[in-house]
Amino acid sequence: MKKVLALVVAAAMGLSSAAFAAETATPAKTAAPAKTTQTTQHHKKQHKKTVEQKAQAAKKHQKKDGKKAPAKSTSKTTSQPAA
């Protein structure tokens, strides 16, 4: 049974390789493909920021007066005098 299967597979591969060889051996009889025209893409120039815009952006990201927000205390202290 295995020999029969091997022969069938070999025959199928032989036929496919023969068909492939015949296909590649014959010269192409179709007309030459149409000539394609190349189009060039124009890229837009990037807009560069002016010096004033850069300065404004730098000011925006600076910390105000170098002060940090006061830290929240987690402990509860009662400094009110008893009445």
Curated annotation (Swiss-Prot):
Main location: periplasm
Keyword field contains Signal: yes
Post-translational modifications: Proteolytic processing gives rise to the active protein.
UniProt entry keywords in alphabetical sequence: Periplasm, Signal
Subcellular location: Periplasm
Compositionally skewed regions (Basic residues) per UniProt: 57-70
Annotated signal peptide: 1-21
Segments forming a coiled coil: none
Disulfide topology: none
Chain positions listed as propeptide in the UniProt record: 22-56
Plastid recorded as keyword: no
Family the UniProt entry places it in: Belongs to the Asr family.
Biological role: Required for growth and/or survival at acidic conditions.
Name of the molecule in the record: Acid shock protein
Species whose genome carries this gene: Salmonella typhi
Gene name linked to the record: asr
